[in-house]
């Protein structure tokens, strides 16, 4: 019979020979698919239906394997608790399934067209054609050729029992006095034991109490909380739940309260069974941790229940067990908690298979010794069916299956000892001899300790007991629970431990177990003697079984394995002899698949059956497997109901199977029917390898397995306690990472307990050895290595033992939460795909790179705006022609002449009350008073420089206009801040000395501040040290008032003051670094600023103005001092001090006086937001809230501000950002645009090339949200120009923003710097723009977008300006340009321990340096990879140095702005106060990472909360 009609020849017939006793495919196949239940069917009938189904499960005759266990089990556990189906299938704990993602579609950045293109693999059909007819088909399930009987009574067939609880009742009657369980202490002495009769009696009692007193229904969940030494109480409660018809939920971790609460919540358990001692200990733990008892849970102490006593003539209660038996909770490789449901039928299926395997295990003559010749102290009462010895946890996984369930099923006696007992040399072998152990369950960790102790000191084992010598001849199976077979060690155990201690066939005795601890601990492969090997091997070949081939292994070519190909160089004995050859890997086999299992090797990415000799994921289907996860339907569907595909030879298309499999997550292959496992899918590393062959670049991926890398590290790197290896996906590349635990990372302490400096030289040596050995042995180019102290990496519990969890390590590494002390990078070898610009030397502004962009965008328009001239015309208030006015003084005289009694200024106090009204007449008189006083001073003449140091008051305005009249050059500056005298005083003295200040005009408040003891002494001492002669300080508010007006004083403006080159006003701008910039404005410019502002913002004299903060320059200055005079309206003044005390006062004034247009800084709005005021006024009158900025706008910050203020009544259309700088306070604005700002997504990859390209999604790591700065106002023209070639940029690229406006400053005050002079009167290379342009020094672009002009308004095209940032802050790496703000934003988002606004990125001596203000100074090495990865992933560059400063040492200005210049200067001079410095590439002058002693806390596993990132209160005035 050919089962594969589409395959050539008789491949299927030869490869898969039908099992004897199977039935034709056409007789029962259809019936099987209609009736999936195994109820009321014999094992033979089930087997026949399974074979019949296997021949029809796949389309086109493809083999499908055993009966669909998932169909049955899915039915089983979905029926659990018919009243609780919704609860079982709840979505509340659905996690992401473990699914690998295919890389058929890859998004790449094309350097030619600078675009993001999707390249689709069009060769997929050819790949399928390569698979067709060549795939490796699943291995058939084998049949048990004999009935499984009771080992104690061969007449009793075990198939008559319908559940495991019935078997216990049977044992309690027919093996009543035999010992069931024996518990030993750490020294091997019997601690407690129980017979089958007592075990059954106590279990019946627990079941009776649950039925009578708990109020639970069938299938309700009951939690079991017992410690490992309380195994007997655990078994009693477990079977008590089985008998009572409830579902048991074992919980093994009491120290994790969150896990306990999660399990109780998920399972809705209302009853918990435990012991009295355990309950008291749990109570103490809760009290110590200040936790509350879980709610709605009743706690019972089962050790007080006693036994069950049946009344006379009464019958045992009938067993009415539900489908589910128990739910075992475990953690996935990535640490996710989930419960696996186990049904009673699943238990019986597996027990039958295990019993058959154990029954066929070879027994030897010495195993049939007369028990009278053995010490009766230990052997009396033991079961004659066999003795089971283990130290694994009996409450979970394989320990529960073999040590408890199979013990009951087969009637064994189980002897359990704690894991610590294996560390006592000779004790384990003595226990096996003492109890004549037939079966032994261990793991590698314990067995290695036992075997190596014997190798080091054989006498300790041989002479352990004087009563009898060690003899393991009775041992039939030494089962080892493991993930990989350690070939070298199994030789040691077989030949150097079992054989010397009397075992006659040690290689047959050693049995590796391949279990699924994540899926209930089920066995999927182990050594057996059932037969059926001829159906597993190719062409039905069956090799004779000898002691030599009881251990199967192969020697593989290492290079081929990197490509997922299996190339066998030698097998078995030859493999052992040739294992020392280089470039080979020795891999051991478990055995054939489990008896009733269908096993397939599947490509984890495509889910298609693999070709022969190809590594793939092991998928298995068996009635002995669990049905799925509890309350996780999505994950259950993905993991337990996976369907593989077969490639049709006719259509070359994948055809899904009808059979469902369990995805084990194990990677391996099949050879001659035997299963070889290389590791978990999550533990496989891959790395890209590139080379050039004949001018063509080729790329492949090499795969490496964590177990192989770990073994190499442990063998070759000194001082390594344990380690973990994994890869991370950064910048579209897989980068290997190694985490080491080393005693060298223990923080040393002196005798007095003080911590001493860590030996970083030794740590560097260890990491270097690790990098080099992996490169030499495996060609793995390690990305980074980190070191921490032993027992600090995340661990998972397996068989009661803690093992490093690679995926948990990876997650903690990516979050930067592990306590690492040292990190070493090897990026030069590992990172391959760093982008390079068109001109790697001269950068994006070179002629070559610019020419490429120009050619690419040759069909696009040039970037420049239109120009609309709006000169002075008529004054709206007086209807007077003011086109002939040249100064603000003429408009002031117009107000005095026409509206003398109108109110000019009103001061508002801290309570919102109005001060004295200042009419235009009084305003004129106050100005005249100061003029008259200053005229008497001989040293004050036209053209002299004076400093106006005033608080926010009308006195400042009076002094300003007095200077205008006298032809003085005023420089307004704020008063000295007594908290920052070290910055303010030097800047003030610099101003006096270099600009020859003749006088300093102050008011009373400023004078009081200057006369303060601290300030005056600091000022005088600094002046003496700097050899600066302080000018006169004139308190203008104390001048005697007079009633004469300016006109009566006959004050006339000096004609020289009307010269366009004469600076009527000088604005002082301090950068965050407190570097001073002075820009000069003439009288005509001041008028133009007011005119542009009036026209753009539609301002009239009918609405008042408000001046509050930042009144010394910019928008705040002309709102406070000029616009009121220009419009002829009232100006209200609010002191910044009063605003700071009552932030809501600002909006109360706006609402009360119906102010339509005003301004506010970002610091002002942020201060209001942080204060969270209540009782907001009505803000419907405010139509234009201008927010000046001099760089790029944060889209997220604006969105948060807008959301907050809109919630309190401000119109979303009122937010108007204004782009301004020291050369023009009103370059562009969003005022009255009628459109809500919408971020535009730009592609960062294109931006580095100088191009503007939209990004398709905000989820992309290279997406940059950018807000526009509005439209160009009247009398202003902008152009985007290449800063180097001075050519106009085209649409699609960005350049420097040039501006031509009547509001431009006339010069940098008294500057002779050629660079400063070059910025004025600039012209482009071809003269197209003409003259009169000023270079802003900022990069940006113009773009036409369509917006609606308000609600229900038509859509119009607008030309908007987008500002990217200062050109002086950008730096280039590999010919690509980067904005520090983008990188800093990435860094601050990467880790919660990085302070907000606490990063600075700059380039120094060719290195990219990152300075970070960290919250807390312990284990900073864990943050470094997070920072480097985030920069590499989003910006494709590698930072060369990462330096950390402590809280408060990061230089900031008084407005909490980072001081970039000061940071750079401090770094270059070595004066930056750093805590630790990490050199990513190279080191600084041969030094290692800075010596630093952290506050060590072994329990540190988490980072500070986000709330710890709050900053100090910000000053806004």
Swiss-Prot record:
Residues 1-13 have a biased composition (Polar residues). It is a multi-pass membrane protein. SUPFAM superfamilies: Acetyl-CoA synthetase-like. GO terms for biological process: acetyl-CoA biosynthetic process. Signal peptide: none annotated. It is found in: Membrane. Residues 1-26 are annotated as: Disordered. Pfam families: AMP-binding, AMP-dom_DIP2-like, Mug62. The chain crosses the membrane at residues 231-251, 397-417, 510-530, 612-632, 720-740, 956-976, 985-1005, 1051-1071, 1114-1134, 1261-1281, 1353-1373, 1408-1428. Glycans are attached at residues 35, 40, 76, 917, 1178, 1321. It comes from the Eukaryota. InterPro entries: AMP-bd_C (IPR025110), AMP-bd_C_sf (IPR045851), AMP-dep_synth/lig_dom (IPR000873), ANL_N_sf (IPR042099), Dip2-like_dom (IPR037337), Mug62_dom (IPR056881). Keywords: Glycoprotein, Membrane, Transmembrane, Transmembrane helix. One of its GO terms (molecular function) is catalytic activity. GO terms for cellular component: cell division site; membrane; mitotic spindle. PANTHER family: DISCO-INTERACTING PROTEIN 2, DISCO-INTERACTING PROTEIN 2 DIP2 -RELATED. To S.pombe SpAC22F3.04. This is Uncharacterized protein C56F8.02.
């Amino acid at each position: 019979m050919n089962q594969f009609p589409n395959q050539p020849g008789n491949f299927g017939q030869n490869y898969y020979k039908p099992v004897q006793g199977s039935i034709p495919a056409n007789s029962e196949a259809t019936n099987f698919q209609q009736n999936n239940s195994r109820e009321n069917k014999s094992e033979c009938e089930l087997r026949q239906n399974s074979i019949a189904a296997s021949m029809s499960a796949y389309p086109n005759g493809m083999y499908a394997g055993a009966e669909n266990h998932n169909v049955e089990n899915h039915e089983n556990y979905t029926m659990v608790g018919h009243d609780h189906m919704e609860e079982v299938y709840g979505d509340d704990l659905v996690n992401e399934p473990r699914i690998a993602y295919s890389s058929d579609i890859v998004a790449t950045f094309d350097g030619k067209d600078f675009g993001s293109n999707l390249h689709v693999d069009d060769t997929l059909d050819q790949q399928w054609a390569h698979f067709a007819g060549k795939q490796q088909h699943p291995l058939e399930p084998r049949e048990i050729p004999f009935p499984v009987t009771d080992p104690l009574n061969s007449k009793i067939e075990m198939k008559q029992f319908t559940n495991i609880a019935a078997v216990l009742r049977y044992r309690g009657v027919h093996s009543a006095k035999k010992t069931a369980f024996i518990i030993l202490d750490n020294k091997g002495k019997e601690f407690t034991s129980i017979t089958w009769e007592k075990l059954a009696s106590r279990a019946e009692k627990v079941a009776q109490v649950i039925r009578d007193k708990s109020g639970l229904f069938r299938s309700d969940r009951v939690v079991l909380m017992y410690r490992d030494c309380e195994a007997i109480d655990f078994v009693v409660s477990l079977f008590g739940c089985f008998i009572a018809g409830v579902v048991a939920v074992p919980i093994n971790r009491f120290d994790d309260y969150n896990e306990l609460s999660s399990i109780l919540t998920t399972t809705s358990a209302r009853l918990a069974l435990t012991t009295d001692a355990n309950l008291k200990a749990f109570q103490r733990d809760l009290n110590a941790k200040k936790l509350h008892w879980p709610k709605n849970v009743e706690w019972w102490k089962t050790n007080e229940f006693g036994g069950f006593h049946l009344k006379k003539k009464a019958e045992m209660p009938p067993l009415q067990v539900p489908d589910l038996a128990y739910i075992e909770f475990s953690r996935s490789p990535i640490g996710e908690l989930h419960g696996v449901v186990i049904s009673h039928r699943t238990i019986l299926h597996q027990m039958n298979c295990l019993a058959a395997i154990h029954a066929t295990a070879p027994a030897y003559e010495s195993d049939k010794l007369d028990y009278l010749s053995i010490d009766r102290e230990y052997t009396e009462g033991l079961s004659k069916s066999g003795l089971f010895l283990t130290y694994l946890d009996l409450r979970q996984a394989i320990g529960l299956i073999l040590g408890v369930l199979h013990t009951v099923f087969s009637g064994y006696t189980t002897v359990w000892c704690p894991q610590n007992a294996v560390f006592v040399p000779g004790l384990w072998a003595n226990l096996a001899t003492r109890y004549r152990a037939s079966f032994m369950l261990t793991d590698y960790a314990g067995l290695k300790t036992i075997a190596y102790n014997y190798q080091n000191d054989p006498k300790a084992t041989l002479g352990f007991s004087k009563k009898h010598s060690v003899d393991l001849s009775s041992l039939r199976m030494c089962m080892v629970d493991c993930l990989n077979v350690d070939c070298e060690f199994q030789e040691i155990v077989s030949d150097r431990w079992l054989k010397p201690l009397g075992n006659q066939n040690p290689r047959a005795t050693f049995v590796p177990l391949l279990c699924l601890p994540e899926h209930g601990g089920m066995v999927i492969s182990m050594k057996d003697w059932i037969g059926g090997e001829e159906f597993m091997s190719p062409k039905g070949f069956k090799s004779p079984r000898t002691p030599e081939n009881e251990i199967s292994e192969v020697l593989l070519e290492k290079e081929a394995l990197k490509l997922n190909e299996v190339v066998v160089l030698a097998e078995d004995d030859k493999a052992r002899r040739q294992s020392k050859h280089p470039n080979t890997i020795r891999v051991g086999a478990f055995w054939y698949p489990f008896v009733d299992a269908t096993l397939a090797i599947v490509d984890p990415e495509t889910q298609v059956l693999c070709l022969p000799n190809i590594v793939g994921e092991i998928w298995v289907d068996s009635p002995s497997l669990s049905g799925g996860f509890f309350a996780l339907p999505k994950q259950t569907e993905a993991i337990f109901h996976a369907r593989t595909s077969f490639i049709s030879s006719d259509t070359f298309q994948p055809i899904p199977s009808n059979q469902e499999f369990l995805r084990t997550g194990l990677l391996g292959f099949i050879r001659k029917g035997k299963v070889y496992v290389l590791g978990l899918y999550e533990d496989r590393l891959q790395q890209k390898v590139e080379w050039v062959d004949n001018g063509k670049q080729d790329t492949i991926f090499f795969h490496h397995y964590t177990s192989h890398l770990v073994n190499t590290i442990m063998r070759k790197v000194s001082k390594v306690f344990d380690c973990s290896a994994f890869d991370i996906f950064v910048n579209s590349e897989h980068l290997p990472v190694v985490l080491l635990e080393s005693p060298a990372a223990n923080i040393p302490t002196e005798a007095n307990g003080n911590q001493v400096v860590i030996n970083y030289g030794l740590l560097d040596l260890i990491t270097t050895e690790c990098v080099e050995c992996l490169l030499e042995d495996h060609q793995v180019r390690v990305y980074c290595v980190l070191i921490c102290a032993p027992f600090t990496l995340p661990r998972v519990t397996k068989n009661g033992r803690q093992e490093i969890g690679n995926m948990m390590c990876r997650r903690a590494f990516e979050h930067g939460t592990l306590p690492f002390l040292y990190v070493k990078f090897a990026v030069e070898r590992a990172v391959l795909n760093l982008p390079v610009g068109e001109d790697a030397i001269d950068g994006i502004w070179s002629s070559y790179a610019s020419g490429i962009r120009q050619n690419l965008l040759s069909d696009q328009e040039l970037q420049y705006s239109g120009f609309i001239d709006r000169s002075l015309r008529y004054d709206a208030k007086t209807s007077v022609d003011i086109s002939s006015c040249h100064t603000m003084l003429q408009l002031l005289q117009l107000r005095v002449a026409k509206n003398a009694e109108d109110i000019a200024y009103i001061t508002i106090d801290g309570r919102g009350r109005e001060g004295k009204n200042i009419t235009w007449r009084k305003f004129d008189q106050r100005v005249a008073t100061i003029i008259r006083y200053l005229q008497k001073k001989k040293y004050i003449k036209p053209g002299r420089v004076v400093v106006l140091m005033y608080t926010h008051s009308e006195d400042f305005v009076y002094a300003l206009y007095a200077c205008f009249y006298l032809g003085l050059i005023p420089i307004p500056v704020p008063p000295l801040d007594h908290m920052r005298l070290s910055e303010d005083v030097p800047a003030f003295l610099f101003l006096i000395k270099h600009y020859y200040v003749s006088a300093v005009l102050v008011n009373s408040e400023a004078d009081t501040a200057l006369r303060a003891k601290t300030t005056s002494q600091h000022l005088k001492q600094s002046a003496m040290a700097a050899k600066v002669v302080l000018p006169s300080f004139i308190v203008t508010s104390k001048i005697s008032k007079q009633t004469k007006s300016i006109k009566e004083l006959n004050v006339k403006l000096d004609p020289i003051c009307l010269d366009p080159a004469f600076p009527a006003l000088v604005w002082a701008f301090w950068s965050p670094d407190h570097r001073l910039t002075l820009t000069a404005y003439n009288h005509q410019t001041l008028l133009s600023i007011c005119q542009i502002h009036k026209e753009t913002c539609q301002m009239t004299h009918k609405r008042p103005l408000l001046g509050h903060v930042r009144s010394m320059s910019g928008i705040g200055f002309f709102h406070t001092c000029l616009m009121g005079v220009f419009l002829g309206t009232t100006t209200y003044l609010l002191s910044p001090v009063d605003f700071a005390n009552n932030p809501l006062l600002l909006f109360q004034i706006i609402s009360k006086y119906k102010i339509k247009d005003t301004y506010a800084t970002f610091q002002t709005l942020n201060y209001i937001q942080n204060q969270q005021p209540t009782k907001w006024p009505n803000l419907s009158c405010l139509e234009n809230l201008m927010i000046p900025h001099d760089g790029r706008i944060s889209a997220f910050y604006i969105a948060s501000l807008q959301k907050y203020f809109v919630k309190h009544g401000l119109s979303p259309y009122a937010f108007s950002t204004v782009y301004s700088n020291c050369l023009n306070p009103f370059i562009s604005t969003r005022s009255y645009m009628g459109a809500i700002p919408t971020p535009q997504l730009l592609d960062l990859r294109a931006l580095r090339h100088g191009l503007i390209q939209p990004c398709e999604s905000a989820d992309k790591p290279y997406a940059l949200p950018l807000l526009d700065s509005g439209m160009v106002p009247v009398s202003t023209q902008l152009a985007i120009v290449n800063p180097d070639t001075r050519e106009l940029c085209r649409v699609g690229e960005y350049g420097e923003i040039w501006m031509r406006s009547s509001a431009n400053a006339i010069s940098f005050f008294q500057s002779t710097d050629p660079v400063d002079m070059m910025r004025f009167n600039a012209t482009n290379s071809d003269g197209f723009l003409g003259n009169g342009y000023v270079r802003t020094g900022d990069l940006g672009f113009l773009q036409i977008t369509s917006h609606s002009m308000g609600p229900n308004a038509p859509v119009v095209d607008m030309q908007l300006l987008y500002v990217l940032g200062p050109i002086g802050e950008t730096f280039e790496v590999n010919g690509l340009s980067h904005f520090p703000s983008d990188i800093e934003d990435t860094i601050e988002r990467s880790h919660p321990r990085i302070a907000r606004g606490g990063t600075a990125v700059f380039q120094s001596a060719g290195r990219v340096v990152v300075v970070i203000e960290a919250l807390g100074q312990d284990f900073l090495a864990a943050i470094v990879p997070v920072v480097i990865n985030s920069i590499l992933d989003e910006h494709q560059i590698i930072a060369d140095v990462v330096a950390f400063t402590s809280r408060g040492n990061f230089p900031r200005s008084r407005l909490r702005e980072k001081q970039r210049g000061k940071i750079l200067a401090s770094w270059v001079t070595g004066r930056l106060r750093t805590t630790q410095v990490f050199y990513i590439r190279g080191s600084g002058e041969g030094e290692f990472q800075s010596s630093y002693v952290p506050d060590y806390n072994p329990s540190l596993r988490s980072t500070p909360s986000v709330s710890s990132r709050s900053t100090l209160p910000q000053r806004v005035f």
